[in-house]
């Protein structure tokens, strides 16, 4: 069996240090907000905090800001089909992206993604979910690192151990949760 020392990815929509999880072990932050204009002072402050705490800091879909502020990498959502690899310094920055099926996974590989978020793992209010068997079958065809995303909650966090994955992620899983959920999640 493999170890359960998984990389944890937290999506944030606010450039506020208080929104970051208290447990920073193996944590990476993805800033994802398409409605607000980025305030450079806040972005620099968060970048410095992440560097000090050894947290990787990615920005979603904003290649100019990724280059300008020399962030750890770029997150490409599943709806972005552009090829951005020519613009980034791939020696210093990592491209990560999300996908829902084989076609989107191939597109993310073409875009140069080193880590692919495959979603949704469990039932969510939006999409048809993969669940454990289909998730494993989908990722078997590819050699990339995969992160489980979507629908992970208190009732199904233990099922993640059945996956051979690089990391785990969530959008709402880091927001005010019961102590039992945080304890179960922190075991990873």
Per-segment meaning from a language model:
Residues 29, 66, 108, 116, ...:
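Conserved, mostly hydrophobic/aromatic
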Residues 42-58, 81, 86-102, 129-153, ...:
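Alpha-helix-loop-beta-strand connector modules within alpha/beta enzyme cores
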Residues 23-24, 69, 111, 162-164:
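Structural motif
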Residues 1-24, 33, 44:
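N-terminal targeting/leader regions
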Residues 94-126, 130:
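Internal catalytic-core helix/loop-beta-alpha segment
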Residues 10-23, 61-64, 100-107, 153-158:
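Short, acidic/polar
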Residues 4-12, 27-31, 57-59, 74-76, ...:
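Hydrophobic faces of well-ordered beta-strands that scaffold small-molecule active sites
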Residues 74-86, 115-131, 152-188:
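Glycine-rich phosphate-binding active-site loops on the catalytic face of alpha/beta enzymes
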